Amino acid sequence: MRKILFILLIITMAGCSSKKKDLFEVIIYECEQKEESLNLQFEFKGEVELPLEKICDSYKLLQDSIISVMFGEELVDYPTKKALRVYADSSFAEYKKVYEEIFDNAQCTMHDAQLYNYETDIKGKILFYDSNVLSYQRELYTYAGGAHGMTTKTNYVFDIKTGKILTEEDVFGKGFERKITKQLIEKANILRAKGELPEEDELYNSWNIIPNGNFALTDSSVIYTFNPYEIAPYYYGIINIELKLEN
């Protein structure tokens, strides 16, 4: 038997100024699905912030690009609330398939097992925009049993007129790697001195700290995001290194 409970909310952002109501909307979808015959429980929460027409004339291109990086290119043509629902359903189906295979390989019955909980929480938000670019962040939390879940953050910089994802080379020009790497290592050493990064060893050291494509722009800086295990053990969390654009 499969039980589904879902809540769908469409919220227009209300900020300090009434203008924000016309600039962005936030669409939230929550569902809980149970497959009692398999002893499975799945919880999903999705939240996506989208620009509206007053941001720019090409807002639809931006929306399509955001939906593509959030949920997959195949869901771009879906209404946003349906894209969230389809993404949730496919996540549950994939989770269920994995556990069916586990139990088949273990040669035990589903009723012999404990209740397996799986959680997915995906959130997309606008970090910054101006007349040229829009910085966006996709945050994904998953829990599939074990000691803890995993959160990752992925940043995207879009050309606000075309919806195209901009690369580091698009923003900084050719040959950016050496200069950006030098600045990242300098900032990382400051974090290390504060205890916010581990002391260097064979696994985590300056060789790991390079431009990784996971960057966002603000009006005065570029922020590089390093997810757990990239440059530090899990318990250090997500590391952001901010570089001033003037440099």
Regions found by a protein language model. Give the residues of each.
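Positively charged n-region of N-terminal signal peptides that target proteins for export
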Residues: 1-4
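Intrinsic disorder/low-complexity detector
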Residues: 6-8, 161
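Exposed boundary/loop context
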Residues: 8-9, 230
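Residue-level signal for mature regions of secreted extracellular proteins and peptides
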Residues: 9-10, 24
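C-terminal motif of bacterial Sec signal peptides marking the signal peptidase cleavage site
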Residues: 12-15
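Compositionally biased intrinsically disordered regions enriched in Thr/Gly
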Residues: 17-247
